[in-house]
Amino acid sequence: MPAWSDDKRDDPQPCRDADQGKFETTVRDGRARIGRIHTQHGVLETPALLPVINPNIRTIEPREMWDRYGIQGLITNSYIIWKHDDLKQHAVTKGVHDLLNFPGVVMTDSGTFQSYMYGDVEVGVEEIVEFQRLIGVDIATMLDVFSRPDMTEEEAEKAVQTTIDRSQASLDSAQGVMLNGPIQGGIYRHLRKASAQSMGCFDF
């Protein structure tokens, strides 16, 4: 990551088409890995800290994060963008990078947390992935089912299975866009293991 600077940083160069979506391991230590994810908005070095940006509330402007603090990528919420007409129109016509004024890697969440906080979201499993693709995100996230710490084992198991059941349709809707496959299971270790094993069978 570049040192803090008051100077404007150059925008990143897109990766080669053949490298799009590629994860490259550069250092390995046991099961730990350091690597690079190749995207159309630069190469993201991992592990990476991605600040979360609410498109309606910007404590620090995304462009300042890029220029001054050397942030390579950030996360924003596609459901918030989808739900607000002004944000949605801007993102659809000019892209999410223009909406946020951020040239680096943009990853989006799908509305799962909003579902946890406020009840069911108003968008479909395939629809929200298609929307993320439409607005040009680099890394999208499927609409999974959140596993709360206070869930019973039966409830957590249902969240695991529902997330698995939504996976293939979500991948089909992504049409080549990198897609996260979240792991569920809550406080139950055997469910987290089963979730990871099942989700690992898909092309996330």
Where do the PLM segments sit?
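Glycine-rich phosphate/ribose-binding loops and adjacent secondary-structure elements
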Residues: 2-8, 161, 170-204
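Non-catalytic, usually N-terminal nucleic-acid engagement modules in DNA/RNA processing proteins
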Residues: 2-175
